[in-house]
């Protein structure tokens, strides 16, 4: 079995990984609160898993529309789930809560010149609440997450695990694992509330391990096993979440799954609004399907 690589670059990556592992239990959604949402009946008065998942898909559409980083989307989902797992949110307020979490994540991680005006964000999102409503909700969200906006996410682990696996491979084999595909798979998982109950490290490694199984690459499998041991991830936990990820991705690739739609956003931007928006705001990108594996 290969060992965790010991080059200078890999040592830096391991240091980052150890820091994330030490921090990952902080600033995560309350599992008991998420379970209450999952068990709620869809009567129009209570928050449900279906409503939460639709809201996350809308946030993913906005992420694609503005060309924001996946880490911004990941943090927005983290903030949303942390808030929903603590508070009894009425469905009519979910849009404002979701957009507030998204805006907090954008302002926290994106370059200032790329942060849209609140008025533009509300208009493009097709909501009827005001900027004042959004600002008030932002303050409420901040108070409920104890003003701790930054959090450890599965995307951060996905990046680190991928980089460490790349370090363990010969140069000519480093194209065997496609990060864009892994990233797309993680986005699909974020759109299901059940994966917010998984530890970020476990979710990230589950996605990678499942992909490695399909690739049938011994070196990558050995590398993933090393990462599992280093991260102290229980084998049963990993298998449990791998099975759920596999089921999610199968459904996501079928026609039965409702995918995020950025096309609907572009029709509500008038010519005048488009001229007023920064050029980078108006890059409409289709949500890509999960890339095929290269044989």
From Swiss-Prot:
**Which SMART domains does its entry note?**
CYCLIN (SM00385)
List the GO biological process terms.
cell division
Q: What is its main location?
A: nucleus
Q: Transmembrane stretches, by residue range?
A: none
The record's GO CC annotations read: nucleus
Q: Which InterPro entries match?
A: Cyclin, Cyclin-like_dom, Cyclin-like_sf, Cyclin_N
Give the residues annotated as coiled coil: none
Enumerate the UniProt keywords alphabetically: Cell cycle, Cell division, Cyclin, Mitosis, Nucleus
Which gene produces this protein? Answer: CCNG1
Q: Which family does it belong to?
A: Belongs to the cyclin family. Cyclin G subfamily.
Question: What CDD domains does UniProt report for this protein, alphabetically?
Answer: CYCLIN_CCNG1 (cd20583)
Originating organism: Sus scrofa
Role played:
May play a role in growth regulation. Is associated with G2/M phase arrest in response to DNA damage. May be an intermediate by which p53 mediates its role as an inhibitor of cellular proliferation.
- Tell me the Gene3D superfamilies matching this sequence: Cyclin-like
The entry's protein name is: Cyclin-G1
Where does this one sit in the cell?
Nucleus
Superkingdom to which the source organism belongs: Eukaryota
């Amino acid at each position: 079995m290969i060992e965790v690589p010991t080059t200078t670059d890999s040592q830096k990556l391991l240091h980052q990984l150890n820091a994330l592992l030490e921090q990952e239990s902080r600033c995560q959604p309350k599992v008991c609160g998420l379970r209450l949402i999952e068990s709620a009946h869809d009567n129009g008065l209570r928050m449900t898993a279906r409503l939460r998942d639709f809201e996350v898909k809308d946030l993913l559409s906005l992420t694609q529309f503005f060309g924001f980083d996946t880490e911004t989307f990941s943090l927005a989902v983290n903030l949303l789930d942390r808030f929903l797992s603590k508070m009894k949110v009425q469905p009519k307020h979910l849009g404002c809560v979701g957009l507030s979490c998204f805006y907090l994540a954008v302002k926290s991680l994106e370059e200032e010149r790329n942060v849209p005006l609140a008025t533009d964000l509300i208009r493009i999102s097709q909501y009827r609440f005001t900027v004042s409503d959004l600002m008030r909700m932002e303050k409420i969200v901040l108070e409920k997450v104890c003003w701790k906006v930054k959090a450890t996410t599965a995307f951060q682990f996905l990046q680190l695990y991928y980089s460490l696996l790349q370090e363990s491979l010969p140069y000519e084999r480093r194209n065997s694992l496609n990060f864009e595909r892994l990233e797309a798979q993680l986005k699909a998982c974020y759109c299901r509330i059940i994966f917010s109950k998984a530890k970020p490290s476990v979710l990230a490694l589950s996605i990678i391990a499942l992909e490695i199984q399909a690739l049938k690459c011994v070196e990558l499998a050995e590398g993933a096993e090393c990462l599992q041991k280093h991260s102290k991830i229980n084998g049963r936990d990993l298998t449990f979440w791998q099975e759920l990820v596999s089921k999610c991705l199968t459904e996501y690739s079928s026609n039965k799954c409702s995918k995020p739609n950025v096309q609907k956003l572009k029709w509500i931007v008038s010519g005048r609004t488009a001229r007023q928006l920064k050029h980078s705001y108006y890059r409409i990108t289709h949500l890509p399907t999960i890339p095929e594996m290269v044989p």
